[in-house]
């Protein structure tokens, strides 16, 4: 190849530090009434920081990024002064003492645990006016015995029941459901994922 030749590598262009960013961006676009700018947010299951990246690009006030793992978050996200990272932290046992002031926006992308198990902890660290935008991954909601090949939930009825069960669990902790939207991207194995928007004091 000539030294003056420009080379373009074909592939998926990614505006965020992980593909998860596109999932949250799509959900926020589907619910334009959710205000991000200036708010204090919690990113549950932050991992490499895709969701946090979206919030930062939409001018969030600050983000508490929580993950049970360690050292996964992209360097440029971790070093943003608006981000507080809580590594090695199980969100199921999260307390207000760990994060300081309560948050008024919660986003979540959790794996290997049902959302129903973590919602009580999430509610305990939020303001009563908080918005919740959480991703339902059916493969972690329906039970291992109902998974198809490759860990994919192929039955639409099972995917629907996963969303309903999470919505009912949310109602039990005082959260109503305001809307449901499909993720613009499937999970890595092909699972159909959905975002549920919830808010305190909203009818089921």
Model-derived regions: residue spans:
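S-adenosyl-L-methionine
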Residues: 64-117
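Conserved class I S-adenosyl-L-methionine
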Residues: 36-47
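Core SAM-dependent methyltransferase catalytic element
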Residues: 185-204
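S4-like RNA-binding module at protein N-termini
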Residues: 1-30
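Glycine-rich SAM-binding Motif I of class I
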Residues: 49-50, 71
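A short glycine-rich, Lys/Arg-flanked "PGG" loop and its adjoining helix->strand segment in the class I
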Residues: 116-133
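Conserved S-adenosyl-L-methionine
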Residues: 39, 54-62
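Short, glycine-/aromatic-enriched active-site segment of Class I SAM-dependent methyltransferases
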Residues: 138-155
């Amino acid at each position: 190849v000539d030294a003056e030749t420009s080379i373009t590598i074909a592939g998926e262009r990614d505006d965020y530090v992980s593909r998860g960013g596109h999932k949250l961006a799509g959900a926020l676009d589907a619910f334009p009434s959710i205000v991000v700018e200036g708010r204090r947010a919690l990113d549950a299951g932050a991992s490499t920081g895709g969701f946090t990246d979206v919030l930062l690009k939409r001018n969030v006030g600050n983000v508490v990024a929580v993950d049970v793992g360690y050292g996964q978050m992209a360097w440029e996200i971790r070093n943003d002064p608006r981000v507080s990272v809580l590594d090695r932290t199980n969100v199921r046992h999260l307390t207000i003492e760990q994060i300081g002031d309560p948050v008024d926006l919660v986003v979540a992308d959790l794996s290997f645990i049902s959302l129903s198990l973590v919602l009580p902890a999430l509610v305990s660290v939020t303001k009563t006016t908080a918005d919740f935008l959480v991703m339902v991954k059916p493969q972690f909601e329906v039970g291992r015995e109902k998974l198809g090949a490759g860990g994919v939930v192929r039955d639409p009825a099972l995917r629907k029941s996963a969303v309903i069960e999470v919505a009912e669990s949310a109602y039990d902790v005082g959260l109503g459901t305001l809307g449901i939207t499909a993720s613009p991207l499937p999970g890595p194995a092909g699972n159909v994922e959905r975002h549920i928007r919830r808010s305190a004091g909203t009818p089921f």
